[in-house]
């Protein structure tokens, strides 16, 4: 396997794309074989350094509207289909959001994203969030991101005009597995949102969740489908099973499995920010190994309904791995 890993690494470094079959062979690697596993991580790191350098990108998210979601995504604490006890509230007011944004900026965060529950936004609520973004643009130097569910082209244009630079919208899983994760909207709906955001001139941040009982083949399919979308950022969430959701009893992925997956993703999509997102605590401290194995960015602070890592601890750890912030 060692020679095969190096062969594929050299192919990527010649700026050639690896095939699905090649990635399938790569992900079959046994993580108990320390030599092969170390070479995989080292190779992913070389690819990251060649294409992306040593700049790490840190973002933070704010749960600007929580709970009561009409969609039935089986992993999600905010779906109205499941009694998870999640805090429920409408869109937060501008001053509360601005104070949080300024706090994050003072801690050295580069990007700030508002995330809202629900299938999408419209009418007065959407106008309110446009006004909030205009205020954030005027009163901070943060790069502004949005994660507001399904939007159309006109909404994407308005978000861009209000100061948003990046739209985040995960595919969650691959096309042929999506119906097992959500039935109230389609994979096609999500792809349309991503394409409309790009058409409006926004960068896109598109990732998914691993650990939802998908196969390794399905994980790879997701990565290849995301590669076709030409994204700037690829956030990797690790399922954190939430009580009273259909996935509450799913096993949490082992750290070595997560590290192997993110390393192979770097071979597939070499020129993006591969970003640790929700569920990172599943790595049990091995996240710093990932920063030497293809990962080069992170959501810092807490997530939507789960606890994350401290921002100062994250910055220290990332700098210690040789990155610049």
From Swiss-Prot:
Molecular function GO terms recorded: 2 iron, 2 sulfur cluster binding; 4 iron, 4 sulfur cluster binding; biotin synthase activity; iron ion binding
UniProt keyword list: 2Fe-2S, 4Fe-4S, Biotin biosynthesis, Iron, Iron-sulfur, Metal-binding, S-adenosyl-L-methionine, Transferase
Pfam family, one: BATS
Pathway involvement of the protein, from the record: Cofactor biosynthesis; biotin biosynthesis; biotin from 7,8-diaminononanoate: step 2/2
Biological process annotations from GO: biotin biosynthetic process
The protein's Enzyme Commission number: 2.8.1.6
Catalytic activity: (4R,5S)-dethiobiotin + (sulfur carrier)-SH + 2 reduced [2Fe-2S]-[ferredoxin] + 2 S-adenosyl-L-methionine = (sulfur carrier)-H + biotin + 2 5'-deoxyadenosine + 2 L-methionine + 2 oxidized [2Fe-2S]-[ferredoxin]
Keyword match Cell membrane: no
Residues given in the record as [4Fe-4S] cluster binding sites: 69, 73, 76
Function comment: Catalyzes the conversion of dethiobiotin (DTB) to biotin by the insertion of a sulfur atom into dethiobiotin via a radical-based mechanism.
Protein name as it appears in the record: Biotin synthase
Organism expressing this protein natively: Clostridioides difficile (strain 630) (Peptoclostridium difficile)
